[in-house]
Amino acid sequence: MKMGTRRAHRQARTVWAAGTVTALCAVALSGCGATAHSARPSASHASASLDAPSQLDPPRPAPDISLTNSLGQRATHSRYRGKAVLLTFIYDHCPDVCPLIVANLHNALSMLGARAREVQIVAVSVDPKGDTPATVKAFLAAREMTGRMQYLIGSLRELAPVWRAWGVAVQATPDRREVGHSAFVYGINASGNVTALYPANLKPAWIAHDAPLLAAE
């Protein structure tokens, strides 16, 4: 597949061991205003570019996710086979990086027009206590993403295995007002394989270009 991400330097790599994603580049933590480190970091770490997408070669199967959304409905990643899936990890009271990611994804959907129906955006919470059905609903409504993004929440016991499976580092500040976390967007093709990794400051045009290609695979 010749995607827009091939034009970027491959400044990040992902290793996959025993069915678990360990993102070498996903250890750069976005504290949403804070600097944090994971208490239990991934086995291998490397610095990552925050201004260019990366192609994952070869693609690898995406670890499945089974969590509930803000409506209490169970959602799994495998449910979206046949679509391009853009997966990210955020929290709804983040002051900067998370809203930026969602705004860029919203703009990408607008650029896609009718083809946006081929894309499913999924967000997984990194704040089990702060992200509630009510706050998530308000977050989605404020950003015109109601019905356009599945925002999955749960308890720490439910979310922590998902973070580990995706190599996402999470650490709340002592006052729990902010959460340091890996801030990337994973591009998953229609066959359920992760093929690309986008930085938090992704350009909507990258997604508008790549999403139809992901949906066709």
Language model features: what each stretch is:
Residues 77-105:
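Short active-site neighborhood of thiol/selenol oxidoreductases, capturing the structured segment around
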Residues 173-217:
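Thiol-/selenol-based redox modules, centered on thioredoxin-like
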Residues 83-84, 101-123, 141-142:
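Conserved helix-turn-beta segment immediately C-terminal to the redox Cys motif
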Residues 137-182:
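Short, internal strand/loop/helix patches
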Residues 117-131, 148-157:
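Thiol-based oxidoreductase modules, predominantly thioredoxin-like and allied folds used
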